[in-house]
């Protein structure tokens, strides 16, 4: 089979205005970024059409280093729905450069189920990440300047909370000291970098309903505390308007196309392990304004992306998914059943059977939200008929719909069974109205504990002294009504990446808490999760090159 990049180059792309017109967007509303990419104004959102559209969330079993293929399944499902005559649009997140050049490689789907132009989407795309990075670091520069210019007046901050961001994986930037040298270099202070997908600006962009809401949220960003324990925000700097200007284009959703020429919105890119893991509300609603079926995904496993999709994105936006599709692979399930990474391509029925406990736990959790769930098995060439039969029988025993997804190798034709299952389930057994894991009026501890115990399976929740002090500040600020966004490893229900499967009865430790006052959520950091990843021993960058003007190695 051809490589992803070879398949992408073999597709004869439609002009982006043709793609827009195919779903009902007028040509004059299309702002071209080249021939095959466009920005679409969010003013085209029609809330009445949003209510009538069928929103489908695609999530997955707990992530493994072998990959699950959630984005490929999401794109494939949209292709399959279009194959059976439904007007379907996929709405995804933008890839981050860090993982593209690190361990993961590209994030535009795979095989014959990709969003295109793949190279541009995986690299700089429309510059949204650049704008977010610039806006975030502009706040850092303006804050440092404010402190430098006002130090003679005796003004200072007891604690500076605002860090910097870059869209790279660079462990050496996690903790730094700025302002070294002469006094003219600024105030010496500890700082550090997070990766751009963990930026509060990224979360704000993805949760804002319009430019005015974007500005309001930026104004509320908490930068630090004064010596008399008063919050110091972007509003106090007086630069919310300037920062919003940097994002005036980035807030518009991006329109591209799939390998079969159907529409795809790709906008926003928070990670699900260290942020809330969902594409922008605006892009989702724009897709729902023009599509009868909209397929969206949430990052990593259902314990991370799906939980945050329901408890944060849907709570903030009023969105109600009609169905949740959970993606599983035989390889991933075998790994959760105790099979080592180097042996998961070999037949192992016992390992597969044990790994099904991970799938079962995710399905129980998804049902706790009132969701109707169906399973998509992303088929790999090494999967055996016996393994597929075990998976089918298991789903039948659970009373869960099941279909095999072959979109990677066959495009939309390989997802027709999945598409028919989705349509039939929505028509005959749609999800109930969402039931959130916690109430707005619950305390921060109650919210964390309900997620950790009810969804992860923890039995004891512990807090560092830093986390406890942060909670006191949150209570003092009167923002306990914010939802919680738990940052933890993607490889386990617990905070320990080495514990696979369906672990229960463990201690769950909250190391720190970050107040995202602009994004209006509380980020609780569990275990040793880092908001600036590092590069692996053999980064994907070693395999990326340009030969005769053509990019090689992106996948």
Curated annotation (Swiss-Prot):
Pathway: One-carbon metabolism; tetrahydrofolate interconversion. GO terms for biological process: tetrahydrofolate interconversion. Keywords: ATP-binding, Ligase, Nucleotide-binding, One-carbon metabolism. GO terms for molecular function: ATP binding; formate-tetrahydrofolate ligase activity. Pfam families: FTHFS (PF01268). SUPFAM superfamilies: P-loop containing nucleoside triphosphate hydrolases (SSF52540). It catalyses: (6S)-5,6,7,8-tetrahydrofolate + formate + ATP = (6R)-10-formyltetrahydrofolate + ADP + phosphate. Belongs to the formate--tetrahydrofolate ligase family. HAMAP family: FTHFS. This is Formate--tetrahydrofolate ligase. It comes from Bacteroides thetaiotaomicron (strain ATCC 29148 / DSM 2079 / JCM 5827 / CCUG 10774 / NCTC 10582 / VPI-5482 / E50).
